[in-house]
């Protein structure tokens, strides 16, 4: 039976999700999108129905994230909540329905990229894991590894260095080249840790795309033929750490509403982090709309949020985390 990393979304019945969920992970420039563009038509030729999805493609939050990042002034907690909203919206409205219909779902990045980016920026690892506790466990996670010295020319000669992908918010005194090297090196270290915890299948993505694809094909066929969900023993340690973390006094389960559904989700009263995320979803929808309405342009051409677009992240997070 399909599993999550914690709580189920309201109305989700794991036994009904008969499709396959395959995550392609890796840093910027590793070739994830290229591989998905090769995998999808190949699977369709084999007779599989395929959905591909990826970060910031949510109709609800994707455009808001892009607008918010234009001003280069999004805080790390606010950014994490934006990405979580994008993910939960795609999970509820794209991934789950596709799996229910028997599709193969290919996702360009999954929660691991989102967690790695947040952790490198100093976000509490236990908190960020709890935000994504409703995520479905993929049937396979293929991590495309390329060292930083190979990433640099790939990015430089394709689309160039980007403020956020270069980690300029972390290394403001560095030039973009040095910031990119430092940030991507930190991400590679975090991916190595997450790979051990979540059971990544690591592939050397330094060869050309066709060579990497030839390595992926038999592994994907193996996943499609398997009926078992992978187990990640290292995950138990993180879950135990979360359970042992000091929190507010426990109480009876609290039923909270979830947008676009009439079914309640029972969450223990001391699971305040995940409950806060779900309860904050409406506030984030409003914030995204405000960002669009209140965007202003600075003298150097950058876009930044107006006063009406301010998000108060600490109102959504328990005092022990904020």
Regions of interest found by a model, annotated:
Residues 46-136:
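ATP-dependent small-molecule kinase phosphotransfer cores
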Residues 290-292, 299-301, 305-308:
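Intrinsically disordered, low-complexity segments enriched in small polar residues
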Residues 114, 119-186:
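A glycine- and Lys/Arg-enriched "phosphate-lid" helix/loop adjacent to the NTP-binding pocket
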Residues 2-15, 40, 156-259, 265, ...:
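NTP-dependent small-molecule kinase module
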Residues 14-39:
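Walker A (P-loop) phosphate-binding motif
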Residues 57-59, 111-112, 146-152, 209:
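Conserved nucleotide-binding/hydrolysis micro-motifs of P-loop NTPases
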Residues 38-47:
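A short, Lys/Arg-enriched amphipathic alpha-helix followed by its capping loop at the start of a domain
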Residues 21-24, 104, 141:
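Hydrophobic "anchor" residues on beta-strands that sit immediately upstream
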